[in-house]
A protein has these predicted regions:
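A ligand-binding cleft/hinge motif common to bilobed small-molecule-binding domains
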Residues: 94-102, 219-239
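Bacterial N-terminal signal peptides
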Residues: 9-19
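Short helices/loops that flank or line small-molecule/ion binding pockets
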Residues: 76-83, 103, 207-216
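Extracytoplasmic substrate-binding proteins
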Residues: 28, 95-172, 194-199, 251-288
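A short, structured surface patch at a secondary-structure boundary
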Residues: 27-82, 86-96, 196, 224
Length: 288
């Protein structure tokens, strides 16, 4: 019974948010989702952002904004004290959403998905903040960017690629790689690679070294929000880490690429740039 009541509260919260978005665009937005924060600024709604999450650092305009926690530790009291008329939250933050519903604060429900999910989020976000045309224009621009990348790599051999987005420095422990779902997987496919874990219906996979040997990637593409630690020697040091799996084709041919930058791992307005960088690593000749 309690679970049913909680579900009804959440539904009411989301319906209230939808109704609010249709009648009056939000003027004071609190965003707990860095990807959506980027979208807000990209469609010209930056001045309407009243606070952001603890992890927001782009665009630079967010530097002076109040911080209200993040996915696991949202500060409800501080959020309410800011008197927002829209809060961007993750779909999994059901407790927060229920509390906001009780305070009659509209919620924009964000759910992590693939590239199409980015377009869907923008399509819903634009009207909610009075920026419908700007959001649709950004969607069009992003689709055009991705289309240009597809054109560049069309007809190229598609290497079997291991896309790594998490690993302990100097080690092959704590390995996280792209599975067959999610925006990273979608970007890799557009960039002209074949995800070696495309058959795994998850966004991330934690493979053993034995599994990596069996999958035999032809290219290893590592993406990190921050650069490699260790200065100019870092790439060589990290290549030596991968050399432990010397029988993997990517290691044999030294087709190991390290890309760094937060834009590479955020499902937001910079995915076109990130996808092009993937393609440049996989098919450098297509950009000469």
């Amino acid at each position: 019974m309690a679970a049913h009541s909680k579900k009804l509260t959440l539904i009411a919260c989301l319906l209230f948010a939808l109704g609010a978005a249709e009648t009056a665009p939000a003027k004071r937005v609190v965003s707990l989702v860095p990807a959506v924060t980027e979208m807000l600024f990209a469609i010209g709604a930056g001045p309407q952002v009243a606070a952001v999450s603890s992890y927001d650092d782009f665009p630079p305009d967010v530097a002076g904004l109040p911080r209200v926690g993040a996915l696991l530790d949202p500060d409800v009291e501080r959020i309410l004290a800011l008197r927002p008329d829209l809060v961007i939250s993750y779909g999994s933050q059901t407790s927060l959403q229920s509390q906001l519903a009780s305070a009659r604060v509209p919620v924009f429900d964000y759910r992590h998905a693939g590239l199409e999910g980015i377009f869907d989020t923008l399509h819903r976000l634009g009207p909610a903040v009075g920026r419908r045309s700007e959001a649709e224009r950004l969607i069009s621009d992003l689709r055009a960017q991705l289309g240009r990348v597809r054109t560049r790599v069309r007809g190229k051999a598609r290497p079997r690629t291991l896309l790594v987005f998490g690993r302990e420095p100097g080690s092959l422990r704590g390995l996280y790689v792209s599975g067959g779902r999610g925006f990273l997987h979608d970007m890799l496919e557009i960039a002209g690679g074949v995800d070696v874990f495309a058959d795994v219906d998850r966004e991330s996979v934690q493979p053993s070294q034995e599994t990596l040997l069996a999958r035999a990637p032809e290219v290893i593409l590592e993406v990190r929000a921050k650069g490699l630690a260790g200065g100019a020697d870092a790439p060589a040091q990290e290549r030596r880490v991968w050399s432990r799996l010397f029988s993997i084709p990517a290691v044999k041919s030294d087709r190991i690429h390290f890309l760094s930058g937060d834009y590479l791992v955020v499902p937001g307005p910079r995915v076109g740039r990130a996808t092009e960088d993937f393609a440049r690593a996989l098919h450098p000749d297509a950009f000469q």
